[in-house]
């Protein structure tokens, strides 16, 4: 997004190739897509798991707001006599937060859940082709896992971005074999990062 807006972008890559672990991962992408997931049925077991999630003690203001939002969504779903698989970004956030034993930052978890469908759409606009249905991969909590039809692994995400950078001549520079070891803050905002090269040398990249 920043590069498309004309900003110069520097990407620190810990490994010697772009993408790191994502490139060798299975390629599944979890994102709430109610319309696509509606091809599946809402089993009694899945409904029970949602009801149990919504009965959890409220742990924060945002937690309570998300629970209330999903309750309202479910009420609308029930009013329509819904038998198809229910989902929403709020349910995705609640399930993800609980799966992490509530240790994560719920604000960030919610941003991740909201951003997943947006990035899915952006990837499609860049030429990434998604399968016409979702599934529930091993370890997932809900059948909202998406796969590509034109790639077999996570390398597809990286190749799509690299191709976009190349074809549109975006101002993106990669620094390989370098870990971003610290974030530099100024007035409560990220102002740069500290990079640690493979030989142990450290340097700063300022925004």
Predicted features and spans:
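Glycine-rich FAD pyrophosphate-binding loop
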Residues: 4-25
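Short hydrophobic core segments
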Residues: 10-12, 180, 204-207
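Short, ordered loop/turn segments at secondary-structure junctions
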Residues: 14-17, 29, 34, 179
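Short Asp/Glu-rich motifs
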Residues: 20-22, 42, 141-143
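N-terminal glycine-rich dinucleotide-binding loop that anchors FAD/FMN and/or NAD(P) in oxidoreductases
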Residues: 24-59, 79-82
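Aromatic-residue-lined binding/catalytic grooves and analogous aromatic/hydrophobic interfacial grooves
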Residues: 34, 57-67, 72-82, 99-100, ...
């Amino acid at each position: 997004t920043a590069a498309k807006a004309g900003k110069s972008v520097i990407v620190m890559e810990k490994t010697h190739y772009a993408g790191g672990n994502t490139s060798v991962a299975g390629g599944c992408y979890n994102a709430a897509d109610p319309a696509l997931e509606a091809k599946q049925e809402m089993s009694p077991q899945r409904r029970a798991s949602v009801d149990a999630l919504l009965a959890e003690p409220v742990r924060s203001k945002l937690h309570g707001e998300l629970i209330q939002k999903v309750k309202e969504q479910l009420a609308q779903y029930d009013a329509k006599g819904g038998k198809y698989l229910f989902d929403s970004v709020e349910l995705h956030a609640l399930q993800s937060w609980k799966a992490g034993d509530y240790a994560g930052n719920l604000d960030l978890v919610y941003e991740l859940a909201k951003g997943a469908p947006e990035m899915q759409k952006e990837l499609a606009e860049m030429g990434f082709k998604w399968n016409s249905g979702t599934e529930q991969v091993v370890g997932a909590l809900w059948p909202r896992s998406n796969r590509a039809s034109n790639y077999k692994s996570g390398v597809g995400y990286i190749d799509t971005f690299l191709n976009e950078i190349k074809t549109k001549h975006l101002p993106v520079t990669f620094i390989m074999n370098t870990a971003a070891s610290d974030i530099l803050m100024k007035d409560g905002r990220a102002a740069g990062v500290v990079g640690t090269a493979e030989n142990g040398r450290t340097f700063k990249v300022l925004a």
